[in-house]
């Protein structure tokens, strides 16, 4: 029997099949082989003593490490302009993760009414200079929600971003009812409580949405130095025309990417983040 994992909690996986949702466990062979079922996986299951058993995980068309989801077609990367304060490094890490996994990211800035004007323009310029689509939201008031709905049609969309930015509020506005519990910002840490504690596929009218827990940090250390450059779409047209083969666009002379930076074809803040990430990858490799 084939189905799709809709959510996973405490070692149990809830698989949507022709017979409805079946609670399943995974066979031990997956753990032995270092393979773990993910929300979004297409799986073959068997019934043994009234217990569903995941017997096979079908090949994935896409996969995110964190949040751990499979077979999604695009990502809504949600950040708030304030409460919590926007973390540009974390935003860029989410975008890198999407690019590395061949997912189309759409950047949603929520809480537009709380934005500092100068900061808003800087962040918008940084993202738009890369060619990413940007949607502005005031989710509590419903502003911008129709634009999000348009993007969901015929897609399996992962909703991701840090805690407290309003992902559950956005999902409730899209769905039209209080589907997910919404949390308040933790005053002690000025970060959002992790209201969503597990990833789950939500079926919508024209598509599917994967709601995921919020994160205050994101590790992209699995991306190698030579692959990192391809996670910056604004670099692509300049890669391969540098003087030196294997140029990583940092200290090498006659670098086409750095020339584009000097000509204002690449955003300096994005390039600075690239160099910072490149150095972090190099430092990890030494140990």
From Swiss-Prot:
* Major place of residence: cytoplasm
Instruction: State the name under which the record lists this protein.
Output: Small ribosomal subunit biogenesis GTPase RsgA
Tagged with keyword Phosphoprotein: no
Q: What is its EC number?
A: 3.6.1.-
**Family, similarity comment:** Belongs to the TRAFAC class YlqF/YawG GTPase family. RsgA subfamily.
Write down the top EC class of this protein.
hydrolase
- Report whether Metal-binding shows up as a keyword of the record: yes
Query: Record's Gene3D superfamilies?
Result: Nucleic acid-binding proteins, P-loop containing nucleotide triphosphate hydrolases, Probable gtpase engc, domain 3
Q: Which organism is it from?
A: Clostridium kluyveri (strain ATCC 8527 / DSM 555 / NBRC 12016 / NCIMB 10680 / K1)
> Which cofactors are required for activity?
Zn(2+)
Complex and partners: Monomer. Associates with 30S ribosomal subunit, binds 16S rRNA.
Q: Function of this protein?
A: One of several proteins that assist in the late maturation steps of the functional core of the 30S ribosomal subunit. Helps release RbfA from mature subunits. May play a role in the assembly of ribosomal proteins into the subunit. Circularly permuted GTPase that catalyzes slow GTP hydrolysis, GTPase activity is stimulated by the 30S ribosomal subunit.
For this chain's UniProt record, which GO biological process terms are given?
A: ribosomal small subunit biogenesis
Quote the record's binding site residues for Zn(2+): 242, 247, 249, 255
The note on cofactor binding and number reads: Binds 1 zinc ion per subunit.
Keywords of this entry: Cytoplasm, GTP-binding, Hydrolase, Metal-binding, Nucleotide-binding, Ribosome biogenesis, RNA-binding, rRNA-binding, Zinc
Q: Which GO terms describe its cellular component?
A: cytoplasm
NCBIfam families xrefs = ribosome small subunit-dependent GTPase A (TIGR00157)
Molecular function GO terms recorded: GTP binding; GTPase activity; metal ion binding; rRNA binding
- In which residues is GTP bound? 110-113, 161-169
């Amino acid at each position: 029997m084939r189905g799709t994992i809709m959510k996973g909690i405490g070692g149990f996986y809830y698989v949507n099949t022709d017979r409805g949702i079946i609670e399943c466990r995974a066979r031990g062979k997956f753990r032995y082989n270092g393979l773990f079922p993910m929300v979004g996986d297409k799986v073959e299951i068997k019934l043994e003593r009234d217990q569903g058993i995941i017997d096979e995980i079908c090949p994935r068309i896409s996969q995110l490490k964190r949040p751990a989801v499979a077979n999604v077609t695009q990502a809504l990367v949600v950040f708030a302009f304030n409460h919590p304060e926007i973390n540009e490094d974390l935003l860029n890490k989410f975008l890198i993760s999407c690019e590395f996994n061949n997912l189309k990211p759409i950047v949603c800035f929520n809480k537009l009414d709380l934005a500092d004007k100068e900061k808003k323009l800087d962040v918008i310029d940084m993202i738009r200079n890369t060619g990413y689509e940007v949607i502005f939201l005031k989710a509590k008031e419903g502003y911008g929600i129709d634009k999000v709905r348009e993007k969901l049609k015929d897609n399996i969309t992962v909703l991701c971003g840090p805690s407290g930015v309003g992902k559950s509020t956005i999902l409730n506005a899209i769905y039209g009812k209080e589907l997910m519990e919404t949390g308040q910002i933790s005053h002690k840490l000025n970060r959002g409580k992790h209201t969503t504690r597990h990833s789950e596929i939500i079926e919508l009218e024209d598509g599917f949405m994967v709601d995921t827990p919020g994160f205050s940090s994101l590790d992209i250390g699995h991306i190698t130095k030579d692959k990192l450059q391809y996670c910056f779409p604004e670099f692509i047209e300049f890669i391969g025309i540098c003087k030196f083969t294997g140029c990583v666009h940092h200290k090498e002379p006659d670098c086409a990417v750095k020339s584009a930076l000097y000509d204002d074809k690449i955003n300096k803040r994005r390039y600075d983040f690239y160099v910072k990430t490149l150095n972090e990858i190099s430092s990890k490799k030494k140990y």
